[in-house]
Amino acid sequence: MIALIQRVSQARVTVEGRTTGEIGAGLLALVCAERGDTEAQADRLLAKMLSYRVFSDADGKMNLPVQNMDGNGGAGGLLVVSQFTLAADTNSGTRPSFTPAASPEDGRRLYGYFVERARASHPDVQTGEFGAMMQVSLTNDGPVTFWLRVPPPGNA
């Protein structure tokens, strides 16, 4: 399972003109399930993402996670958006192959599971809409962007 996380000062996702999720300072996470992923990959990815230290401490060092981004226990927002294109195979030709991505059914199930677990673990979780054409706007703070991946079993 893959997450492209971006430290943002604000982010919003809209579908057909209506806002489905919006946060202030926090993380925008573009999330993709790969073929062979299970709930175990979702759990590991979420744990890593919530504890990944990308926010600055009092000394200006990237040392704080989204769950404690102000250094006093204050959590930032988390905007989770599905994006199957993160699993694209771009190694040959000029057109990406999406064979490595999970099927739409598995992707929907694992995205739903990921969001459910995120909401159980974090106070401010907003989302996009799985499978919809979305417009995502953000102000990347830094910019700070990281690619996190927990590979499917047997596929390092």
From Swiss-Prot:
CDD domains: Dtyr_deacylase (cd00563). Belongs to the DTD family. NCBIfam families: D-aminoacyl-tRNA deacylase. It comes from Cupriavidus pinatubonensis (strain JMP 134 / LMG 1197). An aminoacyl-tRNA editing enzyme that deacylates mischarged D-aminoacyl-tRNAs. Also deacylates mischarged glycyl-tRNA(Ala), protecting cells against glycine mischarging by AlaRS. Acts via tRNA-based rather than protein-based catalysis; rejects L-amino acids rather than detecting D-amino acids in the active site. By recycling D-aminoacyl-tRNA to D-amino acids and free tRNA molecules, this enzyme counteracts the toxicity associated with the formation of D-aminoacyl-tRNA entities in vivo and helps enforce protein L-homochirality. Its main location: cytoplasm. Keywords: Cytoplasm, Hydrolase, RNA-binding, tRNA-binding. InterPro entries: Daa-tRNA_deacyls_DTD (IPR003732), DTD-like_sf (IPR023509). GO terms for molecular function: D-tyrosyl-tRNA(Tyr) deacylase activity; Gly-tRNA(Ala) deacylase activity; Ser(Gly)-tRNA(Ala) hydrolase activity; tRNA binding. It is found in: Cytoplasm. Disulfide bonds: none annotated. This is D-aminoacyl-tRNA deacylase. A motif (Gly-cisPro motif, important for rejection of L-amino acids) lies at residues 142-143. GO terms for cellular component: cytoplasm. A Gly-cisPro motif from one monomer fits into the active site of the other monomer to allow specific chiral rejection of L-amino acids. Its EC number is 3.1.1.96. GO terms for biological process: D-amino acid catabolic process. It catalyses: glycyl-tRNA(Ala) + H2O = tRNA(Ala) + glycine + H(+); a D-aminoacyl-tRNA + H2O = a tRNA + a D-alpha-amino acid + H(+). It holds the Pfam family Tyr_Deacylase.
